[in-house]
Amino acid sequence: MAMAQKLSHLLPSLRQVIQEPQLSLQPEPVFTVDRAEVPPLFWKPYIYAGYRPLHQTWRFYFRTLFQQHNEAVNVWTHLLAALVLLLRLALFVETVDFWGDPHALPLFIIVLASFTYLSFSALAHLLQAKSEFWHYSFFFLDYVGVAVYQFGSALAHFYYAIEPAWHAQVQAVFLPMAAFLAWLSCIGSCYNKYIQKPGLLGRTCQEVPSVLAYALDISPVVHRIFVSSDPTTDDPALLYHKCQVVFFLLAAAFFSTFMPERWFPGSCHVFGQGHQLFHIFLVLCTLAQLEAVALDYEARRPIYEPLHTHWPHNFSGLFLLTVGSSILTAFLLSQLVQRKLDQKTK
């Protein structure tokens, strides 16, 4: 009888032990919400669902890497491309003497710059939903990556792809102007994000410096395409250069027009957004560009070695200056954002 009483007291306590962990478990967080449940800062044109809730843990946002939401494709397009670039760099290391060949440094810089913009972009699209401050800050970081890539592209084109005639015209100003325009592009993009004005002023701040930077950066390639119009010329890199131009123009078109989601409002929450197509064509542009630059590095040494015997400017210093000034710009704008948000909460 005493044993039965002890067991009757023990069984409820065992049931409590089993049930308590179940009661203590928090409900699984909701991974996506409608547009009305997030601030207007996070809204995308014509996208009404698939947003991630704010103010979750960092672990939550990293877990969304494997969930469906309206930024998932943007994350994976650039994340996978960054991994492909690491594999491409491993192949370069087997065939290119980066330490012993001084002419290989621009090739390394363009690979590094490409990996930087792709990884920064993937990080921004993955984590920007944490809060308003982090939304601004991560996209400022994204614009730093774009500026770094702009200068890396300019350097690679100027070093390997340029024809002697165009080199003679622009050698004194090309790289300093490329560094300045890359930084100006970073400033314009960050400022446009900061002021949050979708009209003419915002687009001018972001797009005009970027257009000027691209026009300068791609000029050695365009000049070479026009002067190498002979179809019998054995220049396999030229096809890749043409492809990178076409892919970039397609990317720019989708970036600027919000197509096709403007044709199907409310139907492109996960797939089919213009920004996703912008990412895809930009990745194709970068991969074609790297193949062209690699071919030029191997085949055009008799052309570019004499051109770069004496440097009017230190391109490594200009690269570091572009990186440093862009990071400083993003940091200062993030501080302004913090002040603006603090004033809003008072």
Swiss-Prot record:
Residues 94-103, 159-169, 259-276, 338-346 are extracellular. The gene is PAQR7. Belongs to the ADIPOR family. Plasma membrane progesterone (P4) receptor coupled to G proteins. Seems to act through a G(i) mediated pathway. May be involved in oocyte maturation. Involved in neurosteroid inhibition of apoptosis. Also binds dehydroepiandrosterone (DHEA), pregnanolone, pregnenolone and allopregnanolone. GO terms for biological process: oogenesis; response to steroid hormone. The lineage of its organism: Eukaryota, Metazoa, Chordata, Craniata, Vertebrata. GO terms for cellular component: plasma membrane. Expressed in a wide range of tissues including ovary, testis, placenta, uterus and bladder. It comes from Homo sapiens. It is a multi-pass membrane protein. It holds the Pfam family HlyIII. Disulfide bonds: none annotated. Residues 1-72, 125-137, 191-237, 298-316 are cytoplasmic. This is Membrane progestin receptor alpha. Non-classical progesterone receptors involved in extranuclear signaling are classified in 2 groups: the class II progestin and adipoQ receptor (PAQR) family (also called mPRs) (PAQR5, PAQR6, PAQR7, PAQR8 and PAQR9) and the b5-like heme/steroid-binding protein family (also called MAPRs) (PGRMC1, PGRMC2, NENF and CYB5D2). It is found in: Cell membrane. The keyword Transmembrane helix applies. PANTHER family: ADIPOR/PROGESTIN RECEPTOR-RELATED, MEMBRANE PROGESTIN RECEPTOR ALPHA. Keywords: Cell membrane, Developmental protein, Differentiation, Lipid-binding, Membrane, Oogenesis, Receptor, Steroid-binding, Transmembrane, Transmembrane helix. The chain crosses the membrane at residues 73-93, 104-124, 138-158, 170-190, 238-258, 277-297, 317-337. GO terms for molecular function: nuclear steroid receptor activity; steroid binding.
